[in-house]
């Protein structure tokens, strides 16, 4: 889907591909946010694998109740694969999407202070999800909080 300057070597992602085999339809807003998130990750990230030098390509695919991580080197040669169960993240994901829906509705009808309160809740859930993700990736992937948050 997206790539960054391949000359930026180091412990970082330079390409991210999301497999949309589920065929799920997303709103234009959701697609825009997804594209921005990928762009932001590629612009600034910390991503490494124990015993492997970067840069890396990351292919993510949802398979049942797991996310399949396919990690490759800059030549697109596979160097690691693993599955991560979604279960531990399910509540945070569900709550986050609910708060986002509430936020988009609030933009049209609520006061700035009410919108700010909803946004603070969204950010707190985002942070919680980031911490959970980092814990789930511990030992498999080396990353920082900012990258996990994106």
Predicted regions and their residues:
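Generic signature of intrinsically disordered, low-complexity, basic-rich segments
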Residues: 31, 49-50, 73, 81, ...
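Long, charge-dense
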Residues: 3-25, 92-112, 116-123, 132
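Charge-rich, low-complexity N-terminal segments
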Residues: 1-57
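A surface-exposed, charged beta-strand/loop segment in the N-terminal or early-internal portion
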Residues: 54-101
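C-terminal charged interaction modules
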Residues: 114-150
